[in-house]
Amino acid sequence: MKLYLIRHGESEANSTASHAGWAQVSLTGKGEGEARAVGECLRREDLTFDRIYTSDLRRAMQTHALALPDTTARTTPHIRVVNVGTLAGRRVADCIDEMGEPYLAAKGRFDFRTWGGENYEMFCTRILQFVRQIEQEDGETIAAFCHGGVIHAVLDMLFSGTLNDGKPVPTEIGIDKPSFACPNCGVFVFEFSKGLWKLRAWNMFDA
């Protein structure tokens, strides 16, 4: 089974360097264009999906609707971006100015509990629930419209062995981990075969 993780297009929060979190922000005009473009790329590859999921946050649902307009997706909260609590909607630069080092340290640890959000363990736990769910379902090709943080979390769990019961499985595409940028509307392909996950393509349409 192949899992295509597709990041949403540029959102209003992306365009202002703000925390989005679970706020229902929309795509920008640029983001809408990115969504249509990735749909064209998928069609050029003759890719069809047995099942499609999307985060239940607006920017991911909009991306699905624009990229694959003649398809239906199941919404799920399990692949939402990390919950940043009351930081949602606030510009990162303003948070730095106001809170300084304590904020930067928490952000670096991916720990937003101070503001009523999640930490990294909580975030990964619900994403892993989604992964374990799709392992049990029928279908050879699955798409999930989600968020950059979700995609990086899946990658981290692959490198750490969490996805594979403690067995790290190296990437087979010749890219070092620090090189893994995750642009808006990037497409990232993971494969589950014989009980193990592998990374098959990172940002597959990158020029």
Predicted regions and their residues:
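Acidic, low-complexity terminal tails and accessory targeting/binding regions
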Residues: 76, 82-94, 156-207
